[in-house]
């Protein structure tokens, strides 16, 4: 009986360290972050025609915020230089095993002009998504989380901010957030456990700085055109530039 107890104890000593999870992550050393990945997301083809939004048909107050002018949807925004806006870019694989410090503050999603601002954003796992209303009309914020818990909260004009904790990674794809009152209002929030992500803007470019040397899978995501992935190996103090191109789809 004594020999059996000793054998069980030995097995525990041998196998317990191998079953570690997040506790095995190493604290990030900023001195290692010497590499940078930059790039652009291009659009190949004819710009799709976006039907203007009749805000007045849903809410006169929304239309008044824009002087009655019809607004263009944000689904596909092609920049003047032929690049694509509102594309989420992130390091999909390659930084596992590191525990990165959390940023100060939370991520903000503002309802302004009867739009969600920003249209696409990234945030860190463990941060809160703070939803604010800056409009003189009622909204509701409806999050379709597939990994994080879904939510559906109303926000009348002048209401306090709503803070929603994002406890799990959810970047592939990002979580959709919409307003059920104003059907053109939608946003996409990617929740990532590291700081290496970006969103393309008015020139279609992105930058992922302070990476350690290594091999990475870089994924870009667009709400209409889905994902593209490239693998890149980068050395110490090196900068590499990638180019992604989305073809048009019917």
What do these predicted regions represent?
Residues 1-7:
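Bacterial N-terminal signal peptides that target proteins for export
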Residues 8-15:
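Bacterial N-terminal signal peptides
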Residues 21-250:
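Extracytoplasmic copper-binding redox domains, predominantly the cupredoxin/blue-copper superfamily
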């Amino acid at each position: 009986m004594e020999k059996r107890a000793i054998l069980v104890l030995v097995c525990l000593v041998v196998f317990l360290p191998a079953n570690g999870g997040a506790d095995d992550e190493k604290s990030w050393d900023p001195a290692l972050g010497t590499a940078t990945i930059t790039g652009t997301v291009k659009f190949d083809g004819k710009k799709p025609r976006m039907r203007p939004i009749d805000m007045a048909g849903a809410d006169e107050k929304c239309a008044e915020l824009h002087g009655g002018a019809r607004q263009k949807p944000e689904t596909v925004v092609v920049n003047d230089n032929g690049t694509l806006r509102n594309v989420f870019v992130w390091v999909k694989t390659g930084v596992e095993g590191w525990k990165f410090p959390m940023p100060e503050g939370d991520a903000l999603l503002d309802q302004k002009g009867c739009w969600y601002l920003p249209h696409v954003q990234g945030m860190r796992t463990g941060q809160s998504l703070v939803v604010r209303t800056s409009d003189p009309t009622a909204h509701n914020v409806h999050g379709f989380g597939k990994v994080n818990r879904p939510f559906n909260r109303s926000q009348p004009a002048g209401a306090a901010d709503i803070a929603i904790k994002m406890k799990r990674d959810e970047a592939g794809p990002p979580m959709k957030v919409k307003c059920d009152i104003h059907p053109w209002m939608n946003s996409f929030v990617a929740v990532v456990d590291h700081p290496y992500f970006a969103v393309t803007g008015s020139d279609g470019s992105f930058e992922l700085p302070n990476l350690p040397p290594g091999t990475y899978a870089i994924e870009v995501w667009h709400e209409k055109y889905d994902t593209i992935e490239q693998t890149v190996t980068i050395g110490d103090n090196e900068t590499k530039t990638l180019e992604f191109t989305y073809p048009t789809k019917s």
